[in-house]
């Protein structure tokens, strides 16, 4: 004997049905039980719910396919056999083999634990929208040969959103621009922030200018070279060429570099500084006069 909960696609009331293998034997004994005026196949709107059903046999809302929640509920006429014999009280377990989608009067049913809670037949048709919210029935797939599928509210939308990701063990660079942020989504990788580039670039340059031991064991700074003043011979040669022409050419720069033991870059920079110095002196005398 198996029992399950079905909900017809046109009505919202949950209806219990009982499938019994011994239906033919019960149908034969039905006429004698009610006095000969009642047939087992005349009342298809009765609910069959055995009292021996285990209380643990419950069904959640996700196992019940529901469709057409907003359609009106159709009232079925009471059983003709019950109208003829109002004093006959029919126990549960004698009607089965199908489910009954109609609402049934109290004279045809004797609701027990599950029926008393959900099969209140005195409720009017206007209260069914609120009853749908109470039962927590949501629109799912319609009933058919397939297994009932839970509705969209019974399944988490994005299960991986709140789940923390696997931490990744990465070695962080000892640079101030890389700072591990506390991300709520579970990230553990360092995030680079380019806004603080102006402040941290100075720290980066200062870290480069560390002292490293040379071949002779003396400490040499990798940063800016120490300023070396030019000799008198070098300055004399540079001043002589500057008096001839304030702007130096490529050939002239190579010749001066060869005579003074200076690089071409040093010669070019000296000529630039010399022009700036002369311009400052000229502007100073113009301001005084």
Curated annotation (Swiss-Prot):
The keyword Nucleus appears for this protein: yes
Any Pfam family hit: Homeodomain
Domain of life: Eukaryota
Keywords: Developmental protein, DNA-binding, Homeobox, Nucleus, Transcription, Transcription regulation
SUPFAM superfamilies, sorted: Homeodomain-like
First-listed, main subcellular location of the protein, grouped into a coarse class: nucleus
Keyword match Transmembrane helix: no
InterPro entries: AP_axis_regulatory_Homeobox (IPR051003), HD (IPR001356), Homeobox_CS (IPR017970), Homeodomain-like_sf (IPR009057), HoxA13_N (IPR022067)
GO molecular function, one term: DNA-binding transcription factor activity, RNA polymerase II-specific
Subcellular location: Nucleus
Cross-referenced CDD domains: homeodomain (cd00086)
Signal peptide, first to last residue: none
GO biological process: fin development; negative regulation of transcription by RNA polymerase II; regulation of transcription by RNA polymerase II
SMART domains recorded: HOX
One cellular component (GO) term of this entry: nucleus
Entry's transmembrane regions: none
DNA-binding residue intervals: 223-282
Known role: Sequence-specific transcription factor which is part of a developmental regulatory system that provides cells with specific positional identities on the anterior-posterior axis.
Family listed: Belongs to the Abd-B homeobox family.
PANTHER family tied to this protein: HOMEOBOX PROTEIN HOX-A13A-RELATED, SEGMENTATION PROTEIN FUSHI TARAZU-LIKE PROTEIN
This protein's name: Homeobox protein Hox-A13b
Gene: hoxa13b
């Amino acid at each position: 004997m198996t029992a399950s909960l079905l909900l017809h696609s046109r009505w919202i009331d949950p209806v219990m049905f009982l499938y019994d293998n011994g239906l033919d034997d019960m149908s034969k004994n039905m006429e004698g039980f009610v006095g000969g005026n009642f047939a087992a196949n005349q009342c298809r709107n009765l609910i069959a719910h055995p009292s021996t059903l285990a209380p643990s046999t419950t069904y959640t809302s996700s196992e019940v396919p529901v469709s057409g929640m907003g359609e009106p509920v159709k009232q079925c006429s009471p059983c003709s056999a019950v109208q003829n014999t109002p004093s006959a009280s029919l126990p549960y377990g004698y009607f089965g083999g199908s489910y009954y989608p109609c609402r049934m009067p109290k004279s045809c049913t004797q609701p027990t634990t599950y029926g008393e809670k959900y099969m209140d037949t005195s409720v009017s048709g206007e209260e069914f929208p609120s009853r749908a919210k109470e039962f927590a029935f949501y629109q799912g797939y319609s009933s058919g040969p397939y297994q009932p599928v839970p509705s969209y509210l019974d399944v988490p939308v994005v299960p991986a959103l709140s789940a923390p990701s696997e931490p990744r063990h990465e070695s962080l660079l000892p640079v101030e621009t890389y700072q591990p942020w506390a991300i709520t989504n579970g990230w553990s990788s360092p995030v680079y922030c380019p806004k603080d580039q102006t402040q941290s670039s100075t720290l980066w340059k200062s870290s480069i200018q560390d002292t490293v031991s040379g071949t002779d064991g003396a400490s040499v700074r990798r940063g800016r070279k120490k300023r070396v003043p030019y000799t008198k011979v070098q300055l004399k040669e540079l001043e002589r060429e500057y008096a001839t022409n304030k702007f130096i050419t490529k050939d002239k720069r190579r010749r001066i570099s060869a005579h003074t033991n200076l690089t071409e870059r040093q010669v070019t920079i000296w000529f630039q500084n010399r022009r700036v110095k002369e311009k400052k002196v000229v502007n100073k005398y113009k301001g005084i006069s």
